């Protein structure tokens, strides 16, 4: 708002100066300035709730929200009441439409907890219109975090978000960009290329963005690459998104992020093979970055668990193994400093990752379960509550397990003079205890463990289902289904 105010104040000063100097301003330019004021202070609101209509998908996820609306774009629709409910169909000749869904060359998607700067669309659509960008399907600015976070966990989670912003910028160079999902400008023609038509009962559903996983934007990025489309990260901070303020809501978000990558990586390998047969090989840089993006949570979580649990001795823990990790931590500390954080925050992020270890492992195991059972899981939205969101007992218990186990290893290795592993175990115990205190809270963790234990002992009593009362057939039932009594009488006793 302040940027817009400065812009308008500058325009006012320029107009006053032209009057003082008695200079002529073109009438068309004056008209443009008036139109700009009208557009700034005029807003039109309209909403569309897909579940009000029986002709749209019933799936409860963000992907189907987008698919339902995009599938209706460019159509003039009529509301029609049927026995299944209200449906939307295309208008027929000489009918007046109830809805006119305008078509567009571009689609802007935005999460509910995200905000865009005022020149977001202006800059990104301008880039899409430049010569040579005809095959760019998605352009985005991976969101940044809001400054001045009031809690420690929100600040560290924001630091990891800002580092991801920089990582995504580098992925564009290797044509390995992933659609992040919180915001993007998408070319409608690219969505039409990846559209899949299916049926849900009696409904015909157009799926542009696959909902097989809860990270639907990642899978759509792979689909677009197969059809020769490219994705671009615009190198500016034009979007901002809220970070979960407490550990309970962060668990929901990070567990969702950890789920789905292993399912999509198989599809990526199939597309790599298909592109090879077409003579359009995937370059090594793109291949490595995409595989790392989809599978890094899985292998880093299992690797960290192995490092915490395995009893190393002096023969395995050589100085070269320790030095191999220094470039990673040096680069991360440099990125943190560039984003306005402290270099020492790498230790806080390390503790943050240990606290979230069980969350990431559960998301990874859920992906494996989905792959084995070929099922979908519901989209879990990040809670937005005034008070603290309670955490499942498992996720607040495991940091205590890590602390106790690390202390035991430190005690045992100290007496056996295994100094390398003793130092590592002691460091893990200290960092994890600090992270538990700062990010969860000792009292809050005890509360959540007690509540989880009580819930484990008590099973909620299900209310008995009442027998369905047969209602009198309406005129719609008679027209669409005929005599229901014949059906009841023909059933065996």
Language-model regions: role of each:
Residues 1-273:
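Internal catalytic domains of large membrane-associated glycosyltransferases
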Residues 1-50, 71-74, 292-299, 309, ...:
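N-terminal membrane-anchoring/stem segments of glycan-assembly enzymes
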Residues 11-34, 365-395:
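Multipass alpha-helical transmembrane domains of eukaryotic endomembrane proteins
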Residues 260-284, 359, 363, 436-440:
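C-terminal, non-catalytic tails of nucleotide-sugar-dependent glycosyltransferases
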Residues 275-298, 371, 377-408, 469-493:
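Loop-to-transmembrane boundary segments
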């Amino acid at each position: 708002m302040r940027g817009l105010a400065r812009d308008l104040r500058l325009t006012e000063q320029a107009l006053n100066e032209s009057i003082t100097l008695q200079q002529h301003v073109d009438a068309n330019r004056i008209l443009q300035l008036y139109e700009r004021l009208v557009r700034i202070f005029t807003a039109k609101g309209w909403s569309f709730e897909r579940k009000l209509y029986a002709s749209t998908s019933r799936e409860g996820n963000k992907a189907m929200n987008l698919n339902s609306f995009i599938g209706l774009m460019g159509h003039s629709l009529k509301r029609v009441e049927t026995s299944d409910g209200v449906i939307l169909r295309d208008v027929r000749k000489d009918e007046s439409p109830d809805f006119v869904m305008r078509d567009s060359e571009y689609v802007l998607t935005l999460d509910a907890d995200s905000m865009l700067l005022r020149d977001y669309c202006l800059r990104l659509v301008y880039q899409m219109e430049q010569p040579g960008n005809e095959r760019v399907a998605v352009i985005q600015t991976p969101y940044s975090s809001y400054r001045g976070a009031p809690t420690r966990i929100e600040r560290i989670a924001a630091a990891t978000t800002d580092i991801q912003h920089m990582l995504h910028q580098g992925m564009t160079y290797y044509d390995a960009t992933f659609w992040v999902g919180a915001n993007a400008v998408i070319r409608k023609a690219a969505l039409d290329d990846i559209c899949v038509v299916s049926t849900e009962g009696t409904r015909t559903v157009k799926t542009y963005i696959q909902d097989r996983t809860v990270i639907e934007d990642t899978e759509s990025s792979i689909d677009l690459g197969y059809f020769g489309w490219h994705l671009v990260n615009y190198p500016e901070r034009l979007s901002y998104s809220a970070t979960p303020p407490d550990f309970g809501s962060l668990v929901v978000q990070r567990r969702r992020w950890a789920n789905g990558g292993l399912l999509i990586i198989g599809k990526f390998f199939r597309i790599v093979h298909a592109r090879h047969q077409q003579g359009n090989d995937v370059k090594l840089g793109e291949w490595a970055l995409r595989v790392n993006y989809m599978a890094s949570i899985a292998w880093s979580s299992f690797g960290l668990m192995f490092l915490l649990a395995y009893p190393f001795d002096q023969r395995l823990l050589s100085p070269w193994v320790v030095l191999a990790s220094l470039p990673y931590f040096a680069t991360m500390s440099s990125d943190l400093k560039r984003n306005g954080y402290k270099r020492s925050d790498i230790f806080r992020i390390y503790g943050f990752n240990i606290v979230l270890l069980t969350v990431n492992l559960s998301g990874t195991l859920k992906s494996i379960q989905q792959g084995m059972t070929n099922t979908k899981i519901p989209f879990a939205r990040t809670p937005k509550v005034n008070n603290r969101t309670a955490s499942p007992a498992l996720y607040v218990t495991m940091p205590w397990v890590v602390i106790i186990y690390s202390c035991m290893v430190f005690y045992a290795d100290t007496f056996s003079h295994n100094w390398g592993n003793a130092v590592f175990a002691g460091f893990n115990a200290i960092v994890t205890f600090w992270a538990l205190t700062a990010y969860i809270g000792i009292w809050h963790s005890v509360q959540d463990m007690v509540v989880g234990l009580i819930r484990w002992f008590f099973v909620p009593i299900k209310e008995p289902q009442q027998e369905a009362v047969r209602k009198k057939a309406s005129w719609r039932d008679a027209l669409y289904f005929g005599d229901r009594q014949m059906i009841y009488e023909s059933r065996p006793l």
